[in-house]
Amino acid sequence: MTRGTIQNRDAFLQNIAKRLGRSPRLSGVSQPQWDYAPQWTVFAGYSQDDLLSALREQCKLIHTDYIETTSSELAGALKQQVAAYGGGPVIVPDDPRFAEYGLSALLHDEWPAEQTAVHVWNSSLGRQNIDAAEQANVGIAFSEITLAESGTVVLFSRNEQGRTIHFLPKTYIAIVPKSSVVPRMTQAAAYIHEQIEKGAVVPSCINFITGPSNSADIEMNLVVGVHGPMKAAYIVVTDR
Protein backbone atom coordinates (compact mmCIF):
# COMPACT_ATOMS: atom_id res chain seq x y z
CA MET A 1 0.00 0.00 0.00
CA THR A 2 1.45 3.41 -0.98
CA ARG A 3 1.34 6.48 1.21
CA GLY A 4 -1.07 9.19 0.11
CA THR A 5 -0.30 12.89 -0.28
CA ILE A 6 -2.00 15.95 1.17
CA GLN A 7 -2.58 18.81 -1.27
CA ASN A 8 -3.81 22.39 -0.75
CA ARG A 9 -3.95 21.93 3.04
CA ASP A 10 -2.30 25.27 3.88
CA ALA A 11 -4.52 27.21 1.50
CA PHE A 12 -7.58 25.47 2.90
CA LEU A 13 -6.66 26.24 6.53
CA GLN A 14 -5.75 29.84 5.71
CA ASN A 15 -9.15 30.33 4.12
CA ILE A 16 -10.86 29.04 7.28
CA ALA A 17 -8.73 31.30 9.48
CA LYS A 18 -9.55 34.27 7.27
CA ARG A 19 -13.26 33.58 7.61
CA LEU A 20 -12.82 33.43 11.37
CA GLY A 21 -11.11 36.81 11.32
CA ARG A 22 -7.72 35.67 12.59
CA SER A 23 -4.38 34.41 11.33
CA PRO A 24 -3.72 30.66 11.05
CA ARG A 25 -2.61 28.95 14.26
CA LEU A 26 0.45 26.98 13.26
CA SER A 27 1.84 26.24 16.73
CA GLY A 28 0.85 26.05 20.37
CA VAL A 29 -2.12 23.80 19.69
CA SER A 30 -2.35 20.68 21.84
CA GLN A 31 -4.88 17.93 22.25
CA PRO A 32 -7.23 18.67 25.18
CA GLN A 33 -6.97 16.58 28.32
CA TRP A 34 -10.48 15.75 29.47
CA ASP A 35 -11.35 15.73 33.18
CA TYR A 36 -13.52 12.68 32.68
CA ALA A 37 -13.01 9.78 30.31
CA PRO A 38 -15.71 7.20 31.06
CA GLN A 39 -15.05 5.40 27.78
CA TRP A 40 -11.91 3.90 29.31
CA THR A 41 -13.76 2.43 32.29
CA VAL A 42 -15.91 -0.01 30.30
CA PHE A 43 -14.67 -3.53 31.07
CA ALA A 44 -11.71 -2.02 32.91
CA GLY A 45 -9.70 -4.71 34.66
CA TYR A 46 -11.20 -7.50 32.56
CA SER A 47 -8.90 -10.38 31.73
CA GLN A 48 -8.76 -11.77 28.20
CA ASP A 49 -11.06 -14.59 29.33
CA ASP A 50 -13.51 -12.04 30.75
CA LEU A 51 -13.55 -10.16 27.46
CA LEU A 52 -14.14 -13.40 25.59
CA SER A 53 -17.10 -14.15 27.84
CA ALA A 54 -18.54 -10.69 27.13
CA LEU A 55 -18.07 -11.22 23.39
CA ARG A 56 -19.79 -14.59 23.60
CA GLU A 57 -22.84 -13.09 25.31
CA GLN A 58 -23.00 -10.17 22.89
CA CYS A 59 -23.03 -12.53 19.91
CA LYS A 60 -26.32 -13.93 21.20
CA LEU A 61 -27.84 -10.45 20.90
CA ILE A 62 -26.58 -9.69 17.40
CA HIS A 63 -27.68 -12.98 15.78
CA THR A 64 -24.11 -14.16 15.25
CA ASP A 65 -22.89 -17.74 15.53
CA TYR A 66 -20.04 -18.00 18.03
CA ILE A 67 -17.57 -20.88 17.91
CA GLU A 68 -14.44 -21.44 20.00
CA THR A 69 -11.61 -23.63 18.80
CA THR A 70 -7.83 -23.98 18.84
CA SER A 71 -5.28 -23.61 16.07
CA SER A 72 -5.04 -27.37 15.63
CA GLU A 73 -8.83 -27.70 15.31
CA LEU A 74 -9.46 -24.54 13.30
CA ALA A 75 -9.56 -26.19 9.87
CA GLY A 76 -12.22 -28.64 11.00
CA ALA A 77 -14.28 -25.93 12.70
CA LEU A 78 -14.10 -23.70 9.63
CA LYS A 79 -15.06 -26.51 7.27
CA GLN A 80 -18.00 -27.42 9.50
CA GLN A 81 -19.27 -23.84 9.66
CA VAL A 82 -19.01 -23.36 5.89
CA ALA A 83 -21.01 -26.57 5.44
CA ALA A 84 -23.60 -25.27 7.92
CA TYR A 85 -23.98 -22.17 5.74
CA GLY A 86 -24.53 -24.26 2.61
CA GLY A 87 -20.99 -24.73 1.32
CA GLY A 88 -19.18 -22.74 -1.36
CA PRO A 89 -18.27 -20.87 -3.39
CA VAL A 90 -15.85 -19.35 -0.88
CA ILE A 91 -13.84 -16.13 -1.19
CA VAL A 92 -10.85 -15.21 0.99
CA PRO A 93 -8.20 -12.47 0.99
CA ASP A 94 -4.60 -13.17 0.04
CA ASP A 95 -3.53 -13.33 3.70
CA PRO A 96 -0.45 -15.21 4.98
CA ARG A 97 -2.31 -15.98 8.20
CA PHE A 98 -4.30 -18.68 6.44
CA ALA A 99 -1.03 -20.60 6.09
CA GLU A 100 0.13 -19.66 9.60
CA TYR A 101 -3.12 -21.00 11.07
CA GLY A 102 -2.88 -24.29 9.16
CA LEU A 103 -5.62 -23.61 6.60
CA SER A 104 -3.65 -23.94 3.36
CA ALA A 105 -4.56 -27.59 2.80
CA LEU A 106 -8.26 -26.85 3.31
CA LEU A 107 -8.27 -23.89 0.93
CA HIS A 108 -6.04 -25.22 -1.83
CA ASP A 109 -6.48 -28.99 -1.69
CA GLU A 110 -9.40 -30.29 0.36
CA TRP A 111 -12.16 -27.94 -0.74
CA PRO A 112 -11.20 -27.95 -4.45
CA ALA A 113 -11.10 -31.77 -4.37
CA GLU A 114 -14.67 -31.69 -3.03
CA GLN A 115 -15.76 -29.31 -5.82
CA THR A 116 -16.01 -26.38 -3.40
CA ALA A 117 -14.79 -23.36 -5.36
CA VAL A 118 -12.33 -21.10 -3.52
CA HIS A 119 -11.36 -17.67 -4.87
CA VAL A 120 -8.30 -15.98 -3.37
CA TRP A 121 -8.38 -12.20 -3.86
CA ASN A 122 -5.85 -11.14 -6.48
CA SER A 123 -5.52 -7.42 -7.13
CA SER A 124 -4.24 -8.05 -10.67
CA LEU A 125 -7.61 -9.59 -11.59
CA GLY A 126 -9.47 -6.35 -10.99
CA ARG A 127 -13.23 -6.63 -11.50
CA GLN A 128 -13.07 -10.44 -11.47
CA ASN A 129 -12.56 -10.28 -7.70
CA ILE A 130 -15.78 -8.34 -7.22
CA ASP A 131 -17.65 -10.76 -9.46
CA ALA A 132 -16.29 -13.66 -7.39
CA ALA A 133 -17.39 -11.95 -4.17
CA GLU A 134 -20.87 -11.40 -5.61
CA GLN A 135 -21.17 -15.08 -6.52
CA ALA A 136 -19.66 -16.38 -3.26
CA ASN A 137 -21.80 -18.01 -0.62
CA VAL A 138 -19.22 -17.49 2.15
CA GLY A 139 -16.61 -14.79 2.71
CA ILE A 140 -13.85 -15.53 5.22
CA ALA A 141 -11.29 -13.14 6.73
CA PHE A 142 -9.34 -12.47 9.91
CA SER A 143 -10.46 -9.86 12.44
CA GLU A 144 -7.68 -7.36 13.14
CA ILE A 145 -9.33 -6.01 16.30
CA THR A 146 -12.44 -7.41 17.98
CA LEU A 147 -14.71 -5.34 20.23
CA ALA A 148 -16.19 -7.31 23.11
CA GLU A 149 -18.79 -4.71 24.11
CA SER A 150 -20.57 -4.61 20.74
CA GLY A 151 -19.48 -7.88 19.16
CA THR A 152 -17.73 -6.04 16.35
CA VAL A 153 -14.92 -7.25 14.10
CA VAL A 154 -12.55 -4.66 12.64
CA LEU A 155 -11.30 -5.39 9.12
CA PHE A 156 -8.55 -3.56 7.24
CA SER A 157 -8.97 -3.37 3.48
CA ARG A 158 -5.85 -3.44 1.30
CA ASN A 159 -4.72 -4.59 -2.15
CA GLU A 160 -4.86 -8.21 -1.04
CA GLN A 161 -8.21 -7.85 0.74
CA GLY A 162 -10.95 -5.95 -1.01
CA ARG A 163 -13.86 -4.75 1.10
CA THR A 164 -16.38 -6.61 -1.05
CA ILE A 165 -15.21 -9.84 0.61
CA HIS A 166 -17.07 -8.66 3.71
CA PHE A 167 -20.25 -7.36 2.07
CA LEU A 168 -21.19 -9.24 -1.10
CA PRO A 169 -21.18 -12.94 -0.08
CA LYS A 170 -24.43 -14.35 1.27
CA THR A 171 -22.76 -15.32 4.57
CA TYR A 172 -19.60 -14.28 6.39
CA ILE A 173 -17.12 -15.92 8.76
CA ALA A 174 -14.57 -13.95 10.77
CA ILE A 175 -11.60 -15.77 12.24
CA VAL A 176 -10.96 -14.08 15.59
CA PRO A 177 -7.63 -14.54 17.38
CA LYS A 178 -8.30 -14.38 21.12
CA SER A 179 -5.51 -11.83 21.47
CA SER A 180 -7.39 -9.44 19.15
CA VAL A 181 -10.28 -8.97 21.60
CA VAL A 182 -10.38 -5.56 23.32
CA PRO A 183 -13.12 -3.95 25.44
CA ARG A 184 -14.63 -1.53 22.92
CA MET A 185 -14.15 0.93 20.07
CA THR A 186 -12.10 3.19 22.37
CA GLN A 187 -9.16 0.78 22.27
CA ALA A 188 -9.50 0.17 18.53
CA ALA A 189 -9.43 3.90 17.77
CA ALA A 190 -6.45 4.35 20.10
CA TYR A 191 -4.56 1.59 18.31
CA ILE A 192 -5.26 3.06 14.87
CA HIS A 193 -4.24 6.53 16.10
CA GLU A 194 -1.04 5.09 17.54
CA GLN A 195 -0.17 3.53 14.18
CA ILE A 196 -0.68 6.88 12.47
CA GLU A 197 1.56 8.60 15.04
CA LYS A 198 4.27 6.02 14.33
CA GLY A 199 4.08 6.82 10.63
CA ALA A 200 2.54 3.50 9.64
CA VAL A 201 0.40 3.36 6.51
CA VAL A 202 -3.18 2.94 7.68
CA PRO A 203 -5.78 1.51 5.26
CA SER A 204 -8.10 4.03 3.65
CA CYS A 205 -11.02 1.70 4.38
CA ILE A 206 -11.46 0.25 7.87
CA ASN A 207 -14.70 -1.65 8.38
CA PHE A 208 -16.38 -2.10 11.75
CA ILE A 209 -18.81 -4.99 11.24
CA THR A 210 -21.22 -6.18 13.91
CA GLY A 211 -22.78 -9.50 12.97
CA PRO A 212 -24.97 -9.93 9.87
CA SER A 213 -26.49 -7.03 7.98
CA ASN A 214 -29.43 -5.61 9.96
CA SER A 215 -31.76 -2.84 8.82
CA ALA A 216 -34.84 -1.46 10.55
CA ASP A 217 -37.40 1.11 9.49
CA ILE A 218 -39.27 3.62 11.63
CA GLU A 219 -41.78 0.92 12.59
CA MET A 220 -38.93 -1.19 14.02
CA ASN A 221 -39.32 -3.97 11.49
CA LEU A 222 -35.98 -5.79 11.32
CA VAL A 223 -34.77 -6.88 7.89
CA VAL A 224 -31.62 -9.01 7.64
CA GLY A 225 -29.29 -9.09 4.65
CA VAL A 226 -30.21 -5.89 2.83
CA HIS A 227 -26.75 -4.30 2.95
CA GLY A 228 -24.57 -7.36 3.49
CA PRO A 229 -24.43 -11.01 4.59
CA MET A 230 -27.57 -12.65 5.93
CA LYS A 231 -25.62 -14.77 8.42
CA ALA A 232 -22.35 -14.26 10.27
CA ALA A 233 -20.12 -16.42 12.44
CA TYR A 234 -17.11 -15.64 14.60
CA ILE A 235 -14.64 -18.49 15.05
CA VAL A 236 -12.48 -17.59 18.04
CA VAL A 237 -9.03 -19.18 18.10
CA THR A 238 -8.33 -19.44 21.82
CA ASP A 239 -4.58 -20.12 21.62
CA ARG A 240 -3.73 -17.19 19.38
Curated annotation (Swiss-Prot):
SS bond list: none
Gene3D superfamilies: NagB/RpiA/CoA transferase-like
InterPro entries: FTHF_cligase-like_sf (IPR024185), LUD_dom (IPR003741), LutC (IPR022823), NagB/RpiA_transferase-like (IPR037171)
BP term (GO), one: lactate metabolic process
HAMAP family: LutC
Protein family (similarity comment): Belongs to the LutC/YkgG family.
Function: Is involved in L-lactate degradation and allows cells to grow with lactate as the sole carbon source.
Name of this protein: Lactate utilization protein C
